[in-house]
Regions:
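Bacterial signal peptide processing site
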Residues: 21-23
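Acidic (Asp/Glu)-rich catalytic clusters
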Residues: 137-145, 162-179, 233-234, 248
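Substrate-binding clefts and substrate-entry loops adjacent to catalytic sites
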Residues: 178-193
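Hydrophobic helical h-region of N-terminal Sec-dependent signal peptides
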Residues: 6-14
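C-terminal motif of bacterial Sec signal peptides marking the signal peptidase cleavage site
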Residues: 15-19
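C-terminal active-site subregion of NodB/CE4 polysaccharide deacetylases
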Residues: 29-124, 130-131, 189-279
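Short, well-structured secondary-structure segments
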Residues: 67-69, 78, 99-103, 141, ...
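Positively charged n-region of N-terminal signal peptides that target proteins for export
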Residues: 1-4
């Protein structure tokens, strides 16, 4: 008798549970779409590629780009610009709407005659001095500026020059590390094979150190010849910069681009007038 009563109880319970389930299902089907639970969607962040120039401005004439040339951010000779003056230069660029470029962006601007902003500039430093990290880098971060340091391969970690860790930190924060050869020798005095090795070894060093395609080289002391230009192309660089004065343009040759030397003694206003004269 007890088993019979227990069986009846279990049967009634099952029927009640089934009825509840049907009620919940019907209620969810009748719920307005806005109230129905949706599977959680994952947000996908799409990072705009550096080589996407679809929104860039087409230039009416072949693009011209001021490539600024600094060395040490200190005082003492014509290659050294004091920190206070350097900051005045960066402030002027920001106040006047200039966009600073990476080497890749500079290459695209010069080869496609398109630019990401009405006013663009490429900031470069030769040799890779410690003060580029201690004094220039904080200013660049303060004003949101990109820059490029042409580092001498053999000088990494040596006195007054950047360490690998310093360069890697900067590389994560808008500063590109590019080639100034291995030994900083005047290339026009070397054999074609020596020139090739200086450039190839430097590119390999920085490619491996920063997991990048090192794309631009600065010729030591601005010395170069036709063999230099040939070697720069053969070793895989996209651009080479010289110390020839003026704004860079494609008609100079992508391996013989001019630069704008920034000397000490320039106030922000004087610097600005100098840059504006390059248009």
């Amino acid at each position: 008798m007890k088993r019979f009563i227990l069986s009846i109880f279990l049967l009634v319970s099952c029927l009640a549970l089934a009825a509840c389930a049907d009620t919940e299902a019907n209620a969810e089907q009748q719920m307005p779409k806005a109230e129905q639970k949706k599977p959680e969607e994952k947000t996908i962040h799409v990072q705009k590629k550096e080589d996407d120039t679809s929104a860039w401005i087409k230039t009416e004439k072949p693009a011209k780009l001021p490539i600024l040339m600094y060395h040490s951010i200190s005082s003492g000779n014509s290659l050294r610009v004091p920190k206070e003056e350097f900051e005045a230069h960066m402030k002027w660029l920001q106040d006047n709407g200039y966009q600073t470029l990476t080497p890749k962006e500079a290459y695209l601007m010069l080869t496609q005659d398109k630019k990401p902003s009405e006013k663009c500039v490429l900031i470069t430093f030769d040799d890779g001095y410690t003060d580029n990290y201690q004094d220039a880098y904080p200013v660049l971060k303060k004003y949101g500026m990109k820059a490029t340091i042409f580092m001498i391969g053999k000088s990494i970690g040596h006195q007054h020059h950047l360490t690998e860790n310093q360069m890697k930190e900067m590389a994560q924060n808008g500063v590109s590390i590019e080639s100034h050869t291995i030994d900083h020798l005047e290339l026009n005095g070397l054999s074609p094979e020596q020139q090739y090795n200086e450039m190839a070894d430097s590119k390999k060093l920085f490619d491996n150190m920063f997991h990048q395609e090192t794309s631009i080289i600065s010729y030591p002391v601005g010395r170069y010849n036709e063999e230099t230009l040939k070697a720069a192309k053969e070793t895989g660089y996209q651009m080479g910069v010289t110390t020839e004065p003026g704004a860079a343009s494609r008609d100079q040759g992508m391996y013989a681009l001019h630069r704008v030397r920034v000397s000490p003694g320039m106030s922000g206003a004087a610097f600005g007038a100098y840059i504006e004269s390059m248009k």
